[in-house]
């Protein structure tokens, strides 16, 4: 559903405007209701349409709490989760706790990741892209894909 990346700005009040190319899809998929939370591996924010979040929430809650990595993931995903709604201009407030977690300032990158978005500081996004290891071995799940 969501793909591509787009440079966007955050205003002084901590709001960002969802690009028009995604606004209609969000309106029809969830009435503009989204959930923002911390990414478990990178200093960026995950943005889910609310119905998509409701599908993965039971899976997050079912993670074993005696497993340190699973508990860390729960703390990040559930502890930072914020239900938000786009305003009539397609803007949404990025909560201060998440802005701090992802080191967000005015310049942002919104990255479509299929059923969700990632929101990065522009600087962190380009550093992450530059750090990609093209020689890294593909996961086994991708070896059968024909692109």
From Swiss-Prot:
InterPro entries: MraZ, MraZ_C, MraZ_dom, MraZ_N, MraZ_sf, SpoVT-AbrB_dom, SpoVT-AbrB_sf. The keyword Hydrolase does not apply. GO terms for biological process: negative regulation of DNA-templated transcription initiation. GO terms for cellular component: cytoplasm; nucleoid. SUPFAM superfamilies: AbrB/MazE/MraZ-like. Coiled coil: none annotated. NCBIfam families: division/cell wall cluster transcriptional repressor MraZ (TIGR00242). HAMAP family: MraZ. This is Transcriptional regulator MraZ. It comes from Teredinibacter turnerae (strain ATCC 39867 / T7901). The lineage of its organism: Bacteria, Pseudomonadati, Pseudomonadota, Gammaproteobacteria, Cellvibrionales.
